[in-house]
Amino acid sequence: MGLIEGMFTPDMLGKIFAFLCALFWALAVILFKKSGEAMKPLSLNLYKSLVSTLLLIPVLILAGVDLLPEGLFARDYLILIVSGIIGIAISDTLFFKSLNLLGAGLTAIVDCLYSPIIILLSFLILLNPVSFMELTGGLLVISAILVATLKVKEKERSTRDLLFGFLYGAAAMTFMGFSVTIMKPVLDRASSLWVTELRLIAGTIALIVMVMFNKDRRELFTSLIRRSNFKYAFPATILGSFLALVLWVSAFKMTSINSAAILNQTNTIFIVIFASFFLKEKFTFRRLLATILGMGGSVVVLLG
């Protein structure tokens, strides 16, 4: 790591991490889509969170990360725990629901809501003014979703699936945006690996509680140990919930939020391409236009 840090500035390294995060996450989404054919969203989320939590423990030890970092207060721990519950237990479960209903390509377009939602939350919570460019970018993203869904006749998806798929996706992005917003101040004062692990632990515990109180808890727990489910779920977890998550948190720590978010948003392009190639999802002109509008809107928002 020292050699890498010597070759690149922290800001450049953060940008590289953000781009790699987008690539790994796009591949993971394809695998998670395949996993969702055998595992329900709640059990799939618990599986990937539990495996990622366990995988990160030896990484923390080898990296020499202080398990009880100095300079943090009880409030900081509480913020990260809440961030993990909202951003992992709730947001990721909603994302998997959206992925099952929409498919990878359309879900990638919904992901473009992430940037406008961050701006909206900062306006509602922090009373930050909304600029003309931010408003324009948000409208472009909304246009992308309308282009992708209005008057779409797809045999494999009903109007109800499209509606709920986009609602689940929008809710997932909202919860994720909120979790990032409250996490950032603590992240500036702590190891990104440590922050990632604490959020994972909080999210995993919350998911276990959610499964225990679910009426289908026996099936949900059973699917966690069914070996046939590991074919896609395990590599998806390695790429998406372990590598991509570590890179994601590290990127936000080492470079500006806007730079990291813009590069993260390139996952939209990767997902649409991979979905067409690996999942044989239709790559129509309408979907291409929606992807361009969504990506363009996200960039306009972040540059504004």
Feature-to-residue mapping (PLM):
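Hydrophobic residues within membrane-embedded alpha-helical segments of Major Facilitator Superfamily
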Residues: 17, 24, 31, 51, ...
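Hydrophobic transmembrane alpha-helices of multi-pass small-molecule transport proteins
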Residues: 56, 120-126, 133-152, 286-303
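Alpha-helical transmembrane segments
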Residues: 83, 130-141, 191-203
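Juxtamembrane helix-start motifs in multi-pass secondary transporters
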Residues: 44-45, 107, 195
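Hydrophobic alpha-helical transmembrane segments in multi-pass integral membrane proteins
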Residues: 56-66, 118-130, 173-188, 240-253, ...
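Hydrophobic/small/kink-forming positions within alpha-helical transmembrane segments
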Residues: 26, 57, 85-89, 116-120, ...
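Membrane-interface interhelical linkers
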Residues: 2-24, 29-43, 47-82, 92-102, ...
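Alpha-helical transmembrane segments of compact multi-pass small-molecule transporters, enriched
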Residues: 51-55, 110-124, 139, 201-206, ...
